[in-house]
A protein has these predicted regions:
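GST-like domain detector, emphasizing the conserved glutathione-binding G-site
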Residues: 2-10, 17-80
Length: 80
């Protein structure tokens, strides 16, 4: 089952970098939204998740926070 995934991040965030490095190491292409460069992305993160916290993986529009939880999700549901 294919899910719609989007990673909300900030380039300077070490936890975001951890998730992006995991994605790169496993050849995962997930759309990224930089909340520092894209005010609309920041607004959506606040509106849907109720807070501005990154990294945040939206899974079919539902937010998942915390880098370790995101990596666990990716390794279980996305990695081949």
């Amino acid at each position: 089952m294919n899910r719609q995934l989007t990673l909300y991040h900030m380039p300077s965030c070490p936890y975001c970098l951890k998730v992006r490095r995991y994605m790169e190491a496993h050849d995962m292409e997930i759309p990224l939204r930089d909340i520092t460069a894209d005010p609309a992305a920041r607004d959506q993160l606040q509106r849907v998740g109720g807070k501005v916290q990154v990294p945040c993986l939206f899974i079919d529009g539902t937010p998942l926070y915390e880098s370790d939880d995101i990596i666990t999700y990716l390794s279980t549901h996305v990695a081949s």
